[in-house]
Design a protein with these regions (language model features):
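Membrane-interface loop-to-helix entry segments
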Residues: 1-10, 58-69, 127, 169-170
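Alpha-helical architecture
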Residues: 2-3, 42-43, 60, 64, ...
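Alpha-helical transmembrane segments
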Residues: 8-39, 73-79, 85-89, 94, ...
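Alpha-helical transmembrane segments within multi-pass membrane transporters and channels
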Residues: 39-51
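Anionic group-transfer/hydrolysis microenvironments
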Residues: 47, 68, 187
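Membrane interface segments of multi-pass transport proteins and intramembrane proteases
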Residues: 50-57, 96
C-alpha cells in the first residue's frame, strides 16, 4: 500500500535500536541511508496522496536528492570508518582478483545505493511485490556480513575479515522481520494483481 514503507521502516528502526551496537560505524551508515531514503520515499508518497498527484516529486529532484544523500553518507563513512582495505573490490571465488577502486569507491558506492533503492521501488509498485526479493537479498547479506565479520569463518573461506561487519547481520535480520510483518497486508493485493 501507499506509505507502507513507513511501517516497514518503523519496525526496522525499533529492532535495530534495540538489538544492534549503535557505536558500530556500519550500523550508523545503514541507519542513515535507510532512514534518509525512507523519508524521501515517504515525502514522495505523501505528496502523491495530498495533492492527488500520481507522480509525486519530479524524477529530477528525486534523483538529485538521492545522489546528495548517498554522497554525504558514503563520504562520512569513508572519513570515519577505519578499514584498511575499504576501497578494495573483492570478487567471490577468485582468491587474488582484487581491484582497488581508490577514490572511485565513492561514486561506485553511490551508484550501488541509488540503483538498489530504485530497483526495489520499481519492483514494488503499489502491491508489495518487492517483499520476497528484499527478504532473500537481506538473508544473503546477513550471511555474507556475518561470515566477513567472523575471523574464523573468513579465514576458512579465504575472504577478507572486516571487523564489525557481523553487526550488519542484525540490521539484515531487522529488515527480514519488518518485511515479514508487512506480508499479510500486501499478500491479497499482490494476489489480485496476479489474477488480473
Amino acid at each position: 500500500p501507499t506509505m507502507g514503507g513507513v511501517i516497514i521502516l518503523f519496525g526496522l528502526l525499533i529492532s535495530v535500536l534495540l538489538w544492534a551496537d549503535l557505536s558500530n560505524i556500519n550500523i550508523l551508515f545503514c541507519i542513515y541511508i535507510t532512514v534518509s531514503f525512507g523519508l524521501l520515499g515517504a515525502f514522495d508518497d505523501f505528496k502523491k496522496i495530498k495533492y492527488s498527484n500520481s507522480s509525486g516529486i519530479s524524477s529530477k529532484l528525486k534523483i538529485t536528492l538521492q545522489i546528495l544523500l548517498a554522497v554525504l553518507g558514503v563520504s562520512l563513512f569513508v572519513y570515519y570508518a577505519d578499514f584498511q582495505d575499504m576501497t578494495n573490490l573483492y570478487f567471490p571465488f577468485f582468491k587474488n582478483l582484487i581491484i582497488n577502486l581508490g577514490w572511485f569507491f565513492i561514486p561506485f558506492s553511490v551508484f550501488v545505493i541509488i540503483g538498489s533503492s530504485n530497483a526495489v521501488n520499481l519492483t514494488d509498485g503499489l502491491d508489495g511485490l518487492a517483499t520476497v526479493p528484499v527478504i532473500l537479498v537481506a538473508a544473503c547479506f546477513a550471511f555474507i556480513s556475518y561470515v566477513t565479520g567472523n575471523i574464523v569463518f573468513s579465514n576458512y573461506l579465504q575472504i577478507p575479515y572486516i571487523e564489525g561487519t557481523g553487526e550488519i547481520s542484525i540490521f539484515c535480520g531487522a529488515i527480514i522481520g519488518s518485511c515479514l510483518g508487512s506480508v499479510s497486508y500486501t499478500h491479497l493485493r499482490a494476489h489480485e494483481t496476479q489474477r488480473n
